[in-house]
Regions:
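Mid-to-C-terminal alpha-helical segments outside catalytic/metal-binding sites
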Residues: 1-50, 54, 62-118, 146-154, ...
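Aromatic-lined glycan-binding groove of carbohydrate-active enzymes
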Residues: 260-308
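Catalytic metal-binding/acid-base residues of hydrolase active sites
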Residues: 57, 226-227, 276, 342
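Aromatic- and acidic-residue-enriched segments that line the glycan-binding/catalytic groove
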Residues: 63-76, 135-139, 177, 207, ...
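Hydrophobic faces of well-ordered beta-strands that scaffold small-molecule active sites
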Residues: 52-56, 119-121, 160-163, 189-191, ...
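A general structural motif
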Residues: 250-253, 292-297, 315-319
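Short acidic/glycine-rich loop or secondary-structure boundary segments that cap or lie
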Residues: 61, 231, 279-283, 288, ...
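Active-site gating/metal-coordination segments in enzymes
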Residues: 117-259
Length: 381
């Protein structure tokens, strides 16, 4: 479909995005979901490749208000393990960036400034609310997902949605996952690397049912941390974000690999933020452990990196050489443009970062900028 960007202050030429707009409950949405995904790269009138941000967040203020009386911060590692100064800085950030988090018109201006055509928008990471009792968790998940669907329906040429599900109860999680995809037209879900401190492979959670359904529906799973759950040593200097976030992703991903989730459910489309945590750059140690120790081989029969290579990684490295190393190891086809918008630990110039990566071929650049994300998210011509 053709459209002229009407975002106030946008000086770009008209864009061209030919993909299906997903609208809640419409016959057109049902037909669109059945159409095959085009392998062609979507381009705008300037001829450049589509740019898709896989890592960006929206704060649902109604959901936050509904749970405010329960004091959510006592359950959130990012707040629980934070110094007084860190909490003060975070409060100011939430005030200063309130419009960016929840006002779409402001977001659109920033997207145009950053050169982003489409956001795969996901909830603010704390809005998974795994600490709630299951019924309440399911109710709040529906609130969050319904709002994301409304945003996509109103601006279908700029957004696709990644929802949330109550992983504290796998039956309710599977029900909401199906609703997200089949009724709301969302393209995937955001999860945390643990469920209120329990590993994703914890037998009591029985999350194989969730992963099986995600594979069946062929959706994206975006696994985003909210600080490290044992963050006592990381309270000062914002270390529970700087170190704790990539650490929690590293631990959660390692359990998915060593616990056999990736082996039992081949074809899962899991995206790791912050360039995959520490595994993206220190992967060899897990392979050595697998070769050296029988307790690393109790479930999986192949080296851990053979599974790690099936994950997708965003570009948030803040350094062209680090991003080059990630691409060298896992391939440009596994790396996706990400910003962590609108938080202060995000990448303000994602296009500039990718363009500054040495020895990057044009075809690789296109994959990272949006080609692969468009395929994963079923963004159609």
């Amino acid at each position: 479909m053709m459209f002229t960007c009407t975002t106030p202050g946008c000086n770009e030429l008209a864009h061209e995005h030919r993909f299906a707009a997903v609208r809640k409950g419409s016959a057109a949405a049902a037909r669109a979901r059945k159409r095959s995904v085009s392998s062609k790269l979507v381009r705008d009138k300037k001829g450049r490749s589509l740019r898709v941000d896989i890592h960006c967040h929206y704060l649902n203020r109604d959901a936050a208000a509904k749970l405010a009386h329960l004091n959510p911060s006592q359950y959130e590692p990012s707040v629980k393990f934070a110094s007084a100064l860190t909490r003060e800085v975070n409060v100011k950030q939430m005030q200063d960036r309130a419009a960016k988090l929840s006002t779409i018109e402001v977001r659109l201006k920033d997207m145009d400034r950053m050169g982003i055509d489409i956001q795969a928008v996901s909830p603010a990471p704390q809005q998974t609310y795994y600490w709630t009792e299951p019924g309440l968790g399911a109710e709040v998940s529906r609130m969050v997902n319904d709002r994301l669907a409304e945003i996509v329906a109103k601006w279908p040429d700029r957004f696709v949605g990644l929802g949330t599900v109550p992983l504290q109860n796998v039956e309710l999680a599977v029900i909401e996952l199906e609703r997200c995809v089949k009724q709301l037209g969302l393209r995937g879900v955001e999860i945390n690397p643990n469920v209120a401190g329990k590993e994703l492979t914890d037998p009591s959670l029985n999350l194989d049912r969730f992963f099986a359904k995600a594979r069946e529906l062929d959706i994206v799973i975006f696994m985003h941390p909210i600080g490290f759950t044992q963050g006592d040593r990381l309270m000062d200097h914002y270390l529970n974000n700087i170190i704790g976030n990539p650490l929690d992703t590293t631990v959660g991903t390692s359990h998915l690999i060593f616990g056999g989730v990736m082996e039992r459910h081949p074809g899962l489309k899991i995206v790791l933020p912050h360039a995959g945590g520490f595994l993206g750059h220190y992967w060899a140690r897990m392979d050595h452990g697998w070769r050296a120790r029988p307790d690393c081989r109790t479930v999986i029969k192949k080296p851990p990196t053979s599974y790690l290579k099936k994950f997708f990684f965003d570009t948030i490295t803040f350094d062209p050489e680090m991003l080059r190393n990630l691409i060298d190891k896992f391939g440009a086809e596994q790396v996706l443009l990400g910003t962590d918008y609108p938080f202060d630990m995000g990448e303000e110039d994602p296009v500039g970062l990718i363009n500054s990566v040495p020895r990057l071929k044009p075809s690789e650049k296109q994959m990272i900028m949006g080609r692969t994300a468009a395929r994963l998210l079923k963004i159609r011509r």
